Swiss-Prot record:
<dbReference type="InterPro" id="IPR042114">
    <property type="entry name" value="GatB_C_1"/>
</dbReference>
<dbReference type="InterPro" id="IPR017959">
    <property type="entry name" value="Asn/Gln-tRNA_amidoTrfase_suB/E"/>
</dbReference>
<dbReference type="GO" id="GO:0006412">
    <property type="term" value="P:translation"/>
</dbReference>
<dbReference type="GO" id="GO:0005524">
    <property type="term" value="F:ATP binding"/>
</dbReference>
<dbReference type="InterPro" id="IPR023168">
    <property type="entry name" value="GatB_Yqey_C_2"/>
</dbReference>
<comment type="similarity">
    <text>Belongs to the GatB/GatE family. GatB subfamily.</text>
</comment>
<dbReference type="Pfam" id="PF02934">
    <property type="entry name" value="GatB_N"/>
</dbReference>
<comment type="function">
    <text>Allows the formation of correctly charged Asn-tRNA(Asn) or Gln-tRNA(Gln) through the transamidation of misacylated Asp-tRNA(Asn) or Glu-tRNA(Gln) in organisms which lack either or both of asparaginyl-tRNA or glutaminyl-tRNA synthetases. The reaction takes place in the presence of glutamine and ATP through an activated phospho-Asp-tRNA(Asn) or phospho-Glu-tRNA(Gln).</text>
</comment>
<dbReference type="GO" id="GO:0050566">
    <property type="term" value="F:asparaginyl-tRNA synthase (glutamine-hydrolyzing) activity"/>
</dbReference>
<keyword id="KW-0547">Nucleotide-binding</keyword>
<keyword id="KW-0067">ATP-binding</keyword>
<dbReference type="InterPro" id="IPR004413">
    <property type="entry name" value="GatB"/>
</dbReference>
<dbReference type="InterPro" id="IPR018027">
    <property type="entry name" value="Asn/Gln_amidotransferase"/>
</dbReference>
<comment type="subunit">
    <text>Heterotrimer of A, B and C subunits.</text>
</comment>
<keyword id="KW-0648">Protein biosynthesis</keyword>
<dbReference type="InterPro" id="IPR017958">
    <property type="entry name" value="Gln-tRNA_amidoTrfase_suB_CS"/>
</dbReference>
<dbReference type="Pfam" id="PF02637">
    <property type="entry name" value="GatB_Yqey"/>
</dbReference>
Amino acid sequence: MHFETVIGLEVHVELKTDSKMFSPSPAHFGAEPNSNTNVIDLAYPGVLPVVNKRAVDWAMRAAMALNMEIATESKFDRKNYFYPDNPKAYQISQFDQPIGENGYIDIEVDGETKRIGITRLHMEEDAGKSTHKGEYSLVDLNRQGTPLIEIVSEPDIRSPIEAYAYLEKLRSIIQYTGVSDVKMEEGSLRCDANISLRPYGQEKFGTKAELKNLNSFNYVRKGLEYEEKRQEEELLNGGEIGQETRRFDESTGKTILMRVKEGSDDYRYFPEPDIVPLYIDDAWKKRVRQTIPELPDERKAKYVNELGLPAYDAHVLTLTKEMSDFFESTIEHGADVKLTSNWLMGGVNEYLNKNQVELLDTKLTPENLAGMIKLIEDGTMSSKIAKKVFPELAAKGGNAKQIMEDNGLVQISDEATLLKFVNEALDNNEQSVEDYKNGKGKAMGFLVGQIMKASKGQANPQLVNQLLKQELDKR
């Protein structure tokens, strides 16, 4: 029997507001424990929540960017559960009247475009954070009350790879809107995954398991891959899948049972009596819609249709707004479009990954990168020399030409000097000269390599090719 995988994702995104969802406390990451709290966050008797209008605006902006319908009337509800980092013993969320519904995003997998539906986007407050140490636990309520949006996909995802692509695209769109940093390492983007299997051709969904502790997109993919295999083996062996919550163990790559999954009835939702419903008229919707910036799909189309970039380049460059903005600014400084794309996707990304830094944490600027690329364009600097210059340019900033000169990397373009390298290579490699004369094209490449090696990569490659052909024809 063959099974079809059915996946739905629930993504929590922390909104980048200055204050919390229902209190004036700061909503900043990294403060001393319990320093960003007040009487509302601590659930003192008699205090009342006040809705953060900026958070509502940003929830609407995100929903619109995800092609969602914005509710005319939306209300808040109490989700009841007890946990030490939830001092009210309930969370203010939205149940049956979310702010956004019926959206979608398009993802690309293996060159194919697929539309993934989004059921709803609702607002809620975050809980605090518990840290367990031995026989006791520490509670930090700085995060308590931080504004969140939860984005719930339709069960349209059919593989862990599609789940990864969905998360990548969702993060990109939210980042472009400016409503969140969407940094998993800081908790401003978190994901729970629901997965079930059903026999191919069957319409009824199988029993789902919810996966938690998915702290990176790779862990989402790996957790789903493991759970896919676990459920398939269980079903093939005649077993049943229980509705349960499971935790992904990073060290083993397996999922571990946490608890039997609760249903919405277990939370005893009821309308929040201390907050009146939101009434969102057309004027408010129009005002928010006008704040939506250019989104990744629009930029991607522009890069392909107006700048002539391949679709792959456009996809990579628009994955993050940071990279896309940097690309646009670099070509505005006069750098060649394709060379800039190649450097950002290649040398720049390689440097960022190797040093575990973000682009904006380096000394690289659109201006100094454009300066280096223009030196490559006009033949002043070879690509090989550029690779030696670039790490210092990224680490210290400055001017690529100056770095090249200071390190004795100036490209050799003097014909007399180059002829010495050329003739030396020809004298030392007579067999390659014969091979070239006999029509073996690879011999030319070999000889160029020998010349570049002898000149420590500083020979002007265009002149080398020209002079080498000239000298070969004489022999």
